């Protein structure tokens, strides 16, 4: 069986580390962001490592668990990796909810960091 392309290996490794860290202690995610990183969380924009970590730290739950349904990774023309994640999460005693998240990863000084991060709960309005 052929080995996965390097961008898929890097993307999958990043995703695994991201959600393990998020579920255990999301304040530790500061190491993956830079001062130029951008986060869009449910339509709200945050710029820079400090603002992103503050937002993630102030999310209104004590415990959370993510379950990844699928993930896709692609190389970009400027040597970055774009990763899309679909999954479910359970926060405290709330019902299980679906979510979508997209990351743009860039190699800076031999470390993969997240320059762009977009998150949405998978909520649908039928009617």
Curated annotation (Swiss-Prot):
Matching Pfam families: NTF2 (PF02136)
GO cellular component terms attached to this protein's record: cytoplasm; nuclear pore central transport channel
Compartments in which it is found: Cytoplasm
Biological process, per Gene Ontology: protein import into nucleus
GO molecular function (one): nuclear import signal receptor activity
Biological role: Facilitates protein transport into the nucleus. Interacts with the nucleoporin p62 and with Ran. Acts at a relatively late stage of nuclear protein import, subsequent to the initial docking of nuclear import ligand at the nuclear envelope. Could be part of a multicomponent system of cytosolic factors that assemble at the pore complex during nuclear import.
Record's protein name: Nuclear transport factor 2
Organism: Xenopus laevis
């Amino acid at each position: 069986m052929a080995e996965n392309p390097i961008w898929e290996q890097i993307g999958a490794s990043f995703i695994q580390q991201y959600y393990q860290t998020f579920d255990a202690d999301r304040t530790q995610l500061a190491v993956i962001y830079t001062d130029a990183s951008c986060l869009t969380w449910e339509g709200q924009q945050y710029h820079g490592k400090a603002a992103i970590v503050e937002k993630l730290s102030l999310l209104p739950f004590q415990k959370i668990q993510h379950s990844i349904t699928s993930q896709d990774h692609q190389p970009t023309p400027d040597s970055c990796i774009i990763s899309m994640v679909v999954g479910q999460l359970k926060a405290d005693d709330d019902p299980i909810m679906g979510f979508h998240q997209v990351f743009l990863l860039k190699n800076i000084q031999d470390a993969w960091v997240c320059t762009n991060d977009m998150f949405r709960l998978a909520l649908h309005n039928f009617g």
